[in-house]
From Swiss-Prot:
Sample GO molecular function, one term: tRNA binding
Name of the protein in question: Isoleucine--tRNA ligase
GO terms under cellular component: cytosol
Subunit and interaction comment: Monomer.
Family named by the database record: Belongs to the class-I aminoacyl-tRNA synthetase family. IleS type 1 subfamily.
Organism the protein comes from: Petrotoga mobilis (strain DSM 10674 / SJ95)
Keyword Aminoacyl-tRNA synthetase set for record: yes
Catalytic reactions of this protein: tRNA(Ile) + L-isoleucine + ATP = L-isoleucyl-tRNA(Ile) + AMP + diphosphate
Location in the cell: Cytoplasm
Cofactor(s) it depends on: Zn(2+)
Predominant localisation class: cytoplasm
Motif residue range(s): 'KMSKS' region: 593-597
Binding site for L-isoleucyl-5'-AMP: 552
Gene: ileS
Length: 919
């Protein structure tokens, strides 16, 4: 007789094969159809607000793994918060001004760029930025990121630009903006000033030279300096020594050289000199005020004191050019030294450089070294490879160059100290972020905020044609804000100065009325750093200040986190964020940085096309992102395997609750079998721990906990044990409904817990779940709450012991399988001789059939075992079960085939079949 149709086999249309790359676009279309961001907002509006403010990616090129990682992390946070009942809207944004965009546009134009006006360049830059906003928007949506994609914030929008100028106005009003000539980073290729955050460090090979400066008033005596920038020697006006270091006068032939005593041997070895004698030593302090003669310019160099002089390299006598170095400039201010910077915006020497006029500075190195050698002032020359600042956009080496710029004064009004105090109040994740940003803020120079480019927000400064005064005041800014709010920042470049000024505006210095507008633009970090005001504190959906969270890469300690807190303190006196979370950078499998030249770049689109976005998101969740994160196709394959196990677990749950109506069929906790209560305990422990991990932004723990639960607690333990009960017991029996209640609750809760990480899979599962009052999307549901009364330590300890014994039994069965003694475990009978008294007491509460089900064998008994498998908790004898195999449940039973109504089945199955007929 065929009993196949009497078995409660799993039924579900939830497929084993995910086919994510085909399924995900369908779900995206559904989200589009229901307008999901607005749908969720309408449901959550009125709830506690949670604002994660989006740090704007740069609208330059398509997304890469770094931007994908960042957006997915943000999306995980916001989906979780939405499920927790928060009103957690996501307003994405883009940084759309600045040098990288302008550089790409002008590079593509080539020579044609020189013939275009600033307005024409700006129009091309806007088109370029908007093109990549659209491209990136589609890429982010494809990752499953939910947000107000139809109305993002863009730093080029007039309303945004006006807010930026409002912040600038606050800083001008406080007196913290000044115009000064001091050395700043300058890119000769891009022809603009750069802030620290716009500089990257790469290895660079430089000339390394030791030079003799004749000491005035002493025959044949020279101060020896070392430099890796020979081109800065025309600007030399001083030599710095450390007041507390010991300096030596070294006799070499008929000459006397002065340098730090500790560096004599090293310096002279490099110079190939081994015949020398130290004839005098003295403190650097004694050299202050002495003068040396410049080796090729008709002027003297003053010997000055500076604490930054080190003994790490060089001679302890530091070539000082205030026009080409910040430390040099500070020393120059102290000693009232001349600031010479004989280099133009393109890196060519000016008239001030004398015979080197018109030479490119890098090419002039060779000539300067040649002249020093011919004049007898070159001690030694060579090459050195060292870390050197490069432009973030064109990747060329930058220089320090003294030019007139606008600066934010970080000392006035205790500005820097106020920022440092606010940093202490922020929750930095990880904790080391606080020290990192604090040290950067403490050490950074005044902020150079002007740029000599076209694509950005103009600094509304004017120059008086009568007295030459450059003016930036609140009256002008207020008037320009009104214009830009209506017309956008192009207005500054379109209109004449008089059209941009208030009526009857007069020069505050001379009373003049004729003006010329300046055309410097603001540092792009002012743009993005103002977003707390222009977006978080302004957009209706957000309207929260300070916001709950900023989440970006750790490079933003020197970038957006820093610019934002400086500007927020200027405007409101407080930090713009309560918490700041940082992630590391993407590396390849071997921990190397990704680069096209190494051929190790992994593209997010390639991952999505091969595996689907959920696999990429699972990879994001798997890593402790606070450190650098490795990716490769091998690593992704591991996540594919993890996903497969999770999907199979969910499919099993869905397949076995297809006939379960939670309103009608649920079994109360108190009436459940104890193993079902254990499974609920495991589920609610999972809910508790996963919730804590999400709250702490520890998604790698979520990944681990869920994976562990599915593979160990569910698949290899509970689900294995209950298969017999749910397949074979009566369809509506309490035994089966008890297990189904667990499976149903697990499916509901597990799906919610995976949904922030695997939104596409969770939506697909949600479609297959049967319960009343379902929403259009799982993200409108509420997070599962764990029940404290389910978390019984006593129950856990008891079952830990039982499952430890079960491990022993499974090992014994596996041994017999290897010996070919057994095929299926249901062919076995287990005889146990327990070694543990507590286990004896526990198992005495259950009948032998129940224990056999636990071990997935047909028969079980306690007894003395002379020879058997020695487990940790028992000696185990595995024998063949006695009787015949039941045709329905496959268990072996001595009483199989005893019921004439149901031939070939065991007594249990005969009972079930009778009950089903009579039901």
């Amino acid at each position: 007789m065929d009993y196949k149709d009497t078995i409660n086999l799993p039924k579900t249309s939830f497929k084993m094969k995910a086919n994510l790359k085909e399924k995900e676009p369908q779900i995206l279309q559904k989200w589009e159809d229901i307008n999901i961001a607005y749908y969720l907002r309408n449901i959550r509006i009125g709830g506690t607000k949670f604002v994660l403010h989006d740090g704007p990616p740069y609208a330059n090129g398509d997304i890469h793994m770094g931007t994908a990682l960042n957006k997915v992390l943000k999306d995980i946070v916001l989906k979780y918060k939405t499920l927790r009942g928060y009103d957690a809207p996501y307003v994405p944004g883009w940084d759309t001004h600045g040098l990288p965009i302008e550089h790409n546009v002008t590079t593509k134009l080539g020579e044609k760029a020189n013939a275009l006006s600033k307005l024409e360049i700006r129009k091309l830059c806007e088109d370029y930025a908007m093109k990549y906003v659209d491209i990136q928007r589609e890429s982010f949506k494809r990752l499953g990121v939910i947000g107000f994609w139809d109305k993002p914030y863009l730093t080029l929008k007039p309303e945004y630009e006006a807010k930026v100028l409002e912040i600038l106005r606050s800083i001008v009003e406080s007196g913290n903006i000044y115009r000064g000539t001091k050395p700043i980073y300058w890119c000769t290729e891009c022809q603009t000033a750069l802030a620290e955050a716009e500089v990257e460090y790469h290895d660079h090979t430089s000339d390394s030279i030791y030079v003799k400066f004749p000491l005035v008033g002493e025959n044949n005596t020279y101060v020896i300096i070392w430099t890796t920038t020979p081109w800065t020697l025309p600007a030399n006006v001083a030599i710095a020594v450390h007041p507390n270091f010991d300096y030596a006068k070294v006799e070499i032939g008929n000459e006397y050289w002065i340098m730090a005593k500790e560096l004599v041997d090293k310096t002279l070895k490099e110079a190939g000199i081994d015949d020398y004698k130290i004839i005098d030593t003295f403190k650097g302090l004694t050299l202050e005020g002495e003068k040396a003669r410049h080796p090729f310019v008709d002027r003297e160099s003053l010997l000055v004191l500076a604490d930054y002089v080190t003994l790490d390299e060089g001679t302890g006598c530091v070539h000082t050019a205030p026009g080409h170095g910040m430390e040099d400039y500070i020393t120059g201010t102290k000693y009232n030294l001349q600031v010479i910077s004989p280099v133009d915006s393109q890196g060519y020497f000016t008239d001030e450089a004398g015979k080197y006029k018109g030479m490119k500075i890098w090419e002039a190195n060779k000539e300067i070294i040649k002249d020093l050698k011919e004049n007898g002032f070159l001690v030694q020359s060579g090459k050195i490879t060292h870390s050197y600042p490069h432009c973030w956009r064109c990747k060329n080496p930058v220089i320090f160059r003294a030019t007139p710029q606008w600066f934010i004064d970080l000392e006035k009004n205790n500005y820097r100290e106020k920022v440092l105090e606010e940093i202490k109040k922020v929750n930095w994740i990880p904790k080391w972020g606080e020290n990192r940003i604090s040290s950067m803020v403490r050490e950074r120079p005044d902020w150079v905020i002007s740029r000599q480019r076209a694509w950005g927000i103009p600094i509304p400064a004017i120059k008086c044609e009568n007295c030459g005064e450059t003016i930036l005041d609140t009256k002008i800014i207020d008037h320009v804000i009104e214009i830009i709010e209506k017309e956008g920042s192009n207005a500054w470049f379109e209109k004449e100065a008089k059209e941009l000024l208030p009526n009857d505006y007069r020069c505050p210095k001379c009373g003049g009325s004729e003006f010329k507008k300046e055309e410097d633009i603001l540092d792009v970090w002012i743009d993005s750093g103002s977003s707390f005001e222009a977006v978080a504190n302004s957009r209706e959906e957000l309207k929260k200040f300070p916001v709950d969270l900023y989440l970006e890469g750790s490079d933003q300690h020197r970038g957006w986190f820093q610019s934002s807190i400086f500007l927020s303190v200027a405007k409101h006196g407080i930090a713009p964020y309560e918490s700041v979370l940082t992630h590391g950078f993407i590396k390849d499998e071997e921990g190397k940085k990704m680069s096209k030249s190494l051929g190790n770049v992994v593209n997010p689109k390639d991952i999505i096309n091969k595996y689907g976005a959920d696999i990429l998101r699972l990879w994001v969740a798997s890593a402790d992102y606070r450190m650098d994160i490795k990716i490769s196709y091998n690593i992704l394959e591991q996540q594919v395997e993890t996903y497969r196990k999770l999907r199979n677990t969910i499919r099993f749950l869905l397949g076995n609750i297809n006939d379960f109506d939670p309103d009608e069929d649920s079994v109360a906790y108190e009436e459940m079998l104890e193993i079902d209560q254990w499974a609920l305990m495991k589920l609610h422990n999972l809910i508790k721990n996963v919730t804590k991990a999400y709250d702490n932004y520890e998604f790698y723990k979520v990944h681990y906990l869920i994976n562990n639960f599915c593979t160990i607690d569910m698949s290899s333990t509970y689900l294995d044990i209950i298969k017999d009960r749910i397949y074979v017991e009566g369809k509506k029996s309490k035994l089966r409904r008890s297990a189904q209640t667990v499976l149903y609750e697990t499916a509901i809760a597990l799906n919610k817990m995976i949904s922030p990480i695997l939104p596409f899979t969770a939506e697909e599962v949600y479609e297959h779940l049967n319960y009343s009052n379902k929403y259009e999307t799982i993200f409108a549901e509420l997070w599962p709450e764990y029940k404290e009364n389910y978390l019984s330590e006593e129950l856990e300890e008891k079952w830990n012991k039982i499952f430890a014994l079960r491990e022993d039994v499974l090992k014994a069965l596996e041994e017999k399988r290897k010996e070919k003694f057994l095929g299926n475990s249901l062919d076995a009978k287990i005889i146990l001789n327990l070694k543990d008294d507590t286990l004896k007491q526990i198992l005495s509460q259950y009948d032998n059939n129940w224990i056999a089900d636990l071990f997935i064998v047909s028969q079980f008994e306690f007894g003395n075992v002379d020879e058997g498998f020695e487990g940790r908790y028992a000696t185990i004898k595995v024998t063949k079960a006695e009787g015949e195999k039941c045709e329905r449940c496959w268990k072996v039973d001595p009483n199989t085939d005893n019921d004439p109504d149901f031939p070939g089945v065991c007594p249990r199955c005969a009972r079930v079949l009778k009950e089903e007929i009579n039901a």
